[in-house]
Amino acid sequence: MIKRISISNFKNLLNVPALECDRINALIGPNGSGKSSFLQAIDFLRAFFLTSVEVYLRDHDWDFRDLPNLREARKTISWDIEAELPPGANGRGAGFYHYKVALSPRRYLGVSEECLEYKASFSSPYELLLNREGRSVQWLNRRTGNNEKFKEIGLPASVISRLEPHLAHDKHPELLRFREWVENFRAFLLWDPKVLRTPDRGKHDTLGPSGEHLAPLLAKLKREKPEAFTKLVNRVKRLFPTVSDISVKGGRAWGWQTLHLHEANGHAVVFNSQQMSDGVLRLLALTSLLYLERIHSVITFEEPENGVHPQLIREVVQVLKELTLRKAPNQCQVFFTTHSPYVLDEFFDHPEQVFLVERGRPLEGATIRRLSQRPQLKIVRDAFEQSLGEAWVNGMIGATAGAKL
């Protein structure tokens, strides 16, 4: 998991000093404050482990010129993260990692600086595994114990992206483990009910950013993990008492597959995905993540409670918390944004898991701090009796819209 992260010059994040992160992290603040920028900056780390950063930009329809903070003259964007990782599938690579990387547009877009340090235990000193400054690259060969020069010039991504696992597993086991962890990040946007209910086909192990592949994903779960699928259905039935079953129709070979919702109240009725409610679809998609065999190492969500009845928002937060309780090698960390005071209420006993995101003036960089650092927190909790959300709406803890109503 990410233990600490610092980001410089990425969109609204002009200079975010080192933030201590938890297994689950909620971001609150007004529109345009920088919450989404923070989530995007985390997911952008995946770009360095593709063949080129440009691939990530094309996939997201981004132009690099739109990424640096508009107030800053320099265009270099930098990340500095510390992470604690469990062992990989091969049982290697557990420990603490410190990774620094900078993205700069010179004659071409590329990585101008990259450094990875590692230690097996918290009390051990860091060992330098990779150091890159411009075209000068050195990395540690575990097999020989020597630092070696990397010879490729003008690499538009991380040096680690060039490693072949079958050739480098004994030379660079920690580099491969770190890459594996970052490659397994997943960013979920606002889940679109239109996308969730659309018939789909093919084999998929997870949902797409906007909720793509829900039908084939559930079909695979029912086929390969029937007990897990039954648990998912039972959980949905508990939330929606009129629901009696969920099924997926079609899908022979590579055919299209469609969700169906069954209800029973004296007589059975079957609704296809086009007739299912938005809230049911969203909760079904979110809850399905709990029962997948493999889960992402870091997940970011944009407003996962969106479209869900207020009485069920507690269930949304509960699912997110349960995702973070999975054991190695499926450990998962969650970052999400919210505008719901009901969500904030669920963190009354853990304000250290809430980040306040604010911007004072136009073009000013975002400030991000833990709610637990607010000096007035104790007074607010005593005054508002179990409702941080009410205190937030009333402007008592900051991160408010500032609208003059």
Regions found by a protein language model. Give the residues of each.
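Phosphate-binding P-loop
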Residues: 16-22, 291-294, 327-328
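Conserved ABC ATPase signature
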Residues: 213, 230, 234-291, 298-313
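Conserved P-loop NTP-binding catalytic core
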Residues: 40-108
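C-terminal lobe/lid and adjacent interdomain/linker elements of RecA-like ASCE P-loop ATPase modules
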Residues: 314-405
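Phosphate-binding glycine-rich loops of NTP-binding sites
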Residues: 23-60, 282-289, 318-319, 337, ...
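N-terminal pre-Walker A segment at the start of P-loop NTPase domains
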Residues: 1-14
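Electropositive, glycine-dotted interaction segments
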Residues: 89-234, 238
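Short glycine-/polar-rich loops that comprise or flank the Walker A/P-loop
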Residues: 76-77, 107-109, 183-184, 350-353
